[in-house]
Amino acid sequence: MSSNPSSVEKKLLHYTGKAIADFNMIQRGDKVMVCLSGGKDSFTLLTILNQLRIKSGNKFEIFAFTLDQAQPGWNDACLRQWLAEKSIPHEILTRDTYSIVKEKIPEGKTYCSLCSRLRRGIIYRYAEENGFNKIALGHHRDDLVRTLMMSILYNGDIRSMPPKLLSDNKKHIVIRPLCYVQEKDIITFASEQAFPIIPCNLCGSQENLMRKKVASLIDQLAIENPKVPSNMLHALQSLKPSQLMDQNFWNFKNLEDGLETTQSIQCEEVFNAQEFELEDEKI
């Protein structure tokens, strides 16, 4: 911890440490690869994790990994200097995913999906080749609740970003230690620390992203009720399958079997779902 930490720094240390403890994100001997994109979130994550590492007595290792995707205007000189001053082990790897994205995605469409997929593959491969068993990402509380809202409104399912995830190849654990942290606190901390932020020129120019619309909607609701974002985060930890409609998680069809009655109940279906099917229609 800094010799004289600010109130927001103390807050970040508290909530990051709590998330790590709540979800058992980091254990003794872990080699944690922190994905440092050059944005405020990843700078904050790396800084706070490094302080927690020191506080733990170096019970785990951290390593900063930055992927240079060959975007026009990319300049990591200040980033390299900052990392050297902090004495944090790191590597900046260059892979031209920018050209692939520009070639595959039509002008005006969102690049994020393909860009993140290509980036994820490179990150997993690098972690495996270099012996890192944990991959730390800088998503914060507001990312989680916005993703939840986007999934409901645009995809028709209930999902978000889990605090801890087993990768698809079953070789890594992905962790999000900032999952309890509010974005406004990250903004304040980034300003205090004067991080050498590298803007994303690819995504930043696309103002029509759904995520920005959803963020604006949540912000508007929070004006009327400031607890809206925290309530949404709590909802991710408080699912009640019996109050939803997913038949994979709750046996609605055979609830009669749970009735406490002396009468014998025959649970024969009156209707068959196939009788009411319509082509190409979704409720």
From Swiss-Prot:
Keyword Endoplasmic reticulum: no
CDD domains registered for this protein in UniProt: TtcA-like
Record text on cofactor binding: Binds 1 [4Fe-4S] cluster per subunit. The cluster is chelated by three Cys residues, the fourth Fe has a free coordination site that may bind a sulfur atom transferred from the persulfide of IscS.
SUPFAM superfamilies reported for this sequence: Adenine nucleotide alpha hydrolases-like (SSF52402)
Keyword Cytoplasm applies: yes
Molecular function per GO: 4 iron, 4 sulfur cluster binding; ATP binding; magnesium ion binding; sulfurtransferase activity; tRNA binding
Sequence motif PP-loop motif, location on chain: 37-42
Cofactor: Mg(2+); [4Fe-4S] cluster
Main location: cytoplasm
Additional remark text: The thiolation reaction likely consists of two steps: a first activation step by ATP to form an adenylated intermediate of the target base of tRNA, and a second nucleophilic substitution step of the sulfur (S) atom supplied by the hydrosulfide attached to the Fe-S cluster.
Family (UniProt): Belongs to the TtcA family.
Function: Catalyzes the ATP-dependent 2-thiolation of cytidine in position 32 of tRNA, to form 2-thiocytidine (s(2)C32). The sulfur atoms are provided by the cysteine/cysteine desulfurase (IscS) system.
Protein name per its UniProtKB record: tRNA-cytidine(32) 2-sulfurtransferase
Species in which this protein is naturally found: Legionella pneumophila (strain Lens)
